[in-house]
Amino acid sequence: MAKYRKILVAYDGSLSAQNALSLASQLAREDKSWIKVLAVVPPYLGDLELLGVTDIKATIAGSGQDLLSEAKQLADREGVHILTNLEQGEAYEQIVHVAEEENCDLIVMGRRGKGKMERALIGSVTARVIGHTNKDVLVIPETAKLSWENILLATDGSTCCDNALARALEIAQERKVKLSAVSVVYTNDEFYALGQEVMKELYQEADKVLDKVRKWAGDLGVQAELFVRDGEPHQAITAMAVEMSASLIVMGSHGRKGLTRLLMGSVTERIIGYADCPVLVCHL
């Protein structure tokens, strides 16, 4: 991946977090990047005397230190040196804060399995981090690998998606690989009642979005393959990713419908929840 020099890995000891750290280590080896691993423990707000524990703060902090020791062992096996940080508080707030304080370029987070609930909601921490940070976020499924052979950009031509386009082109140029790009015409039962002229305009708009990809790619000497699909955007994009065996999906944090800070755009959230490959979410 192009020019990420400071990487923050959120680590909670889960299998998905272990895989995220392993792949972040791969990225660090390739690009000589700097890694900080962050563990966040919750604050204790109850009655200390009821617990019968004399030093509850040390007990809570100890669990976080255990996580960081585990992370160091994993990083040692990967052959990379990491710095560590232990914070107490709301996980998403601390991840966003540390990424800003340390001037990180990229936040790496794991994504757990693909059960129905996990597909529907990718996790409040991940969603809130993406909703509140201005950093790029790489979300890595529990069993995914990281490679560059088949990069898929999802774009609707919005400003945020243009930033994702620029990042995807940087990656493709740096890695000397082609870039595939897809723009989706949203269709449902009501769509087919719009009339032929309206439908034609929507497809022409998707073509214009991809014309920008073609031009920017051509200016950088990057080979680009362009696709228009229709249907529910998250379904069309994830199906496209499966069809081309995508190794990475790149997209904006939100599209034309905007973004709420506590819940990212539903298309982005659903793609992260359903994709088999890592998803790079780019901000403005």
Describe every region a protein language model picked out.
Residues T54-D66, V198-K208:
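A short acidic, glycine-rich active-site loop
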Residues A17, G64, I122-G123, C161, ...:
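Short, conserved glycine- and acidic-residue-centered signature motifs
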Residues A20-L23, L67, Q94, A164, ...:
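Well-ordered alpha-helical segments embedded in enzymatic catalytic cores
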Residues K3, Q26, E30, Y92-A144, ...:
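Gly/Ser-rich helix-loop-strand patches that form or flank binding pockets
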Residues S14, P42, G89, K114-G115, ...:
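Residue-level marker for beta-strand->alpha-helix junctions and adjacent short loops that shape enzyme
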Residues M1-A2, L23, T54-A58, G62, ...:
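Structural beta-alpha unit
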Residues M1-T54, E78, N150-G195, M199-Y203, ...:
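Small/aliphatic-rich secondary-structure junction motif
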